[in-house]
Curated annotation (Swiss-Prot):
Keywords of this entry: Aminoacyl-tRNA synthetase, ATP-binding, Cytoplasm, Ligase, Magnesium, Metal-binding, Nucleotide-binding, Protein biosynthesis
Subcellular location: Cytoplasm
UniProt GO BP: phenylalanyl-tRNA aminoacylation
Stored CDD domains: PheRS_alpha_core
Organism of derivation: Flavobacterium johnsoniae (strain ATCC 17061 / DSM 2064 / JCM 8514 / BCRC 14874 / CCUG 350202 / NBRC 14942 / NCIMB 11054 / UW101) (Cytophaga johnsonae)
Subunit structure: Tetramer of two alpha and two beta subunits.
The keyword Protein biosynthesis belongs to this UniProt entry's keyword annotation: yes
Protein known as: Phenylalanine--tRNA ligase alpha subunit
Annotated Pfam families: Phe_tRNA-synt_N, tRNA-synt_2d
Family matches, as PANTHER family: PHENYLALANINE--TRNA LIGASE, MITOCHONDRIAL, PHENYLALANYL-TRNA SYNTHETASE
Gene for this chain: pheS
GO (cellular component) term, any one: cytoplasm
Reactions mediated catalytically: tRNA(Phe) + L-phenylalanine + ATP = L-phenylalanyl-tRNA(Phe) + AMP + diphosphate + H(+)
Entry similarity comment: Belongs to the class-II aminoacyl-tRNA synthetase family. Phe-tRNA synthetase alpha subunit type 1 subfamily.
């Protein structure tokens, strides 16, 4: 009899079913009102006196083992239920992690930054809510200058001197005010213009503008910098600079790259010419240098600017600028970058 009880003790110790149904069956088997321990205690009076001590010890051991096993598994099951409520079911098999991707605008912007960083340009940033001085006046656009009409501006209604910047040239002004030449910096960022939203234009877009100020800077330096950029960005080294007008540069030019006419899309985006405009550039006007406390008799330089969306549309053959702002995951997940 004692050996049989010891066998039950080992079975109770080995029990490890971690579910409520099996645990309840175990409890009833050993601790229930009609369970094994109840039968053994009833049998105690029939045991010879010389065996009662040993018999009582093994019965108590079996009871202690069974009670401890029930308590242990109950605590584990309760802890599991609590973890489900707070953290989810921690026993579920792991699911694959879907890694997001960078926005195409961020991908292209970072590529541009890396290209210019390789030739010594740093990155400068400034506020998107700007004042009239940094956005217009310091850039050779005094009040009532007709060229201000070239940029439809969002003004702050409560303060006409405060506005949403129309270009990142305002960052260049702030940089020149706080740094002495030589200067090599690019200013990426978001800009705002009161334009109708269509497939080709938006009231919010991104620019990257560059500024180089030093002694004896020439237009040839500007051209070589742009040739380097277009070769690195597009794999194309054929460009042309068309005379143009910007208040803050003189002379000024539009930057065109030769895109070619290999596909129907090429004909459409270049209007059959093979040439495509990507930005503007020019030699910094001496008045702009004066406004930033830089002596134009000692220093000169060049500036350039380009739209990030326009470049992204070229690289990825995207026909509608609005797609960048619709947050359509089906569109965004197509773009991958080394993060």
């Amino acid at each position: 009899m004692i050996d049989k009880i010891k066998q039950h003790i080992e079975e109770a110790k080995a029990f490890n079913e971690k579910n409520k149904e099996s645990l309840e069956q175990f409890r009833i088997k050993y601790l229930g009102s009609k369970g094994l321990l109840k039968e053994l205690f009833n049998e105690f009076k029939n045991i010879p006196n010389d065996q009662k001590k040993d018999f009582g010890q093994v019965i108590n051991t079996l009871k202690a083992v069974a009670e401890e096993k029930v308590k242990q598994i109950q605590e584990e099951l309760e802890s599991k239920e609590e973890s489900k409520g707070v953290f989810g079911d921690l026993t579920r098999a792991a699911e694959p992690v879907i890694i997001g991707s960078r926005h195409p605008i961020s991908i292209v912007k970072n590529q541009i930054i890396d290209i210019f960083a390789n030739i010594g340009f740093n990155v400068s940033e400034g506020p998107e809510i700007e004042d009239d001085w940094h956005n217009f006046t310091a850039l050779n656009l005094p009040e009532y200058h007709p060229a201000r009409d070239m940029q439809d501006t969002f003004f702050i209604q409560t303060n006409p001197d405060v506005l949403l910047r129309t270009h990142t040239s305002s960052v260049q002004v702030r940089y020149m005010e706080n740094h002495k030449p030589p200067i090599r910096t690019i200013s990426p960022g978001r800009v705002f213009r009161n334009e109708a939203i269509s497939s080709r234009s938006h009231c919010i877009f991104h620019q990257v503008e560059g500024l180089y100020i030093d002694k004896d800077v020439s237009f040839a330096d500007l051209k070589q910098t742009l040739l380097y950029f277009t070769k690195e960005m597009f794999g194309k080294s054929k460009i042309r600079l068309r005379p143009s007008y910007f208040p803050f540069t003189e002379p000024s030019a539009e930057i065109d790259i030769y895109w070619g006419l290999k596909t129907e899309t090429d004909y459409r985006i270049t209007k059959g010419t093979g040439w495509l405009e990507i930005g503007g550039c020019g030699m910094v006007d001496p008045n702009v240098l004066k406004n930033c406390d830089i002596n134009p008799d000692e220093y000169n330089g060049f500036a350039f600017g380009m739209g990030v969306e326009r470049i992204a549309m070229l690289l990825y053959q995207i026909g509608d600028i609005r797609m960048f702002y619709e947050n359509d995951v089906r569109f965004l997940e197509q773009f991958k970058a080394n993060i």
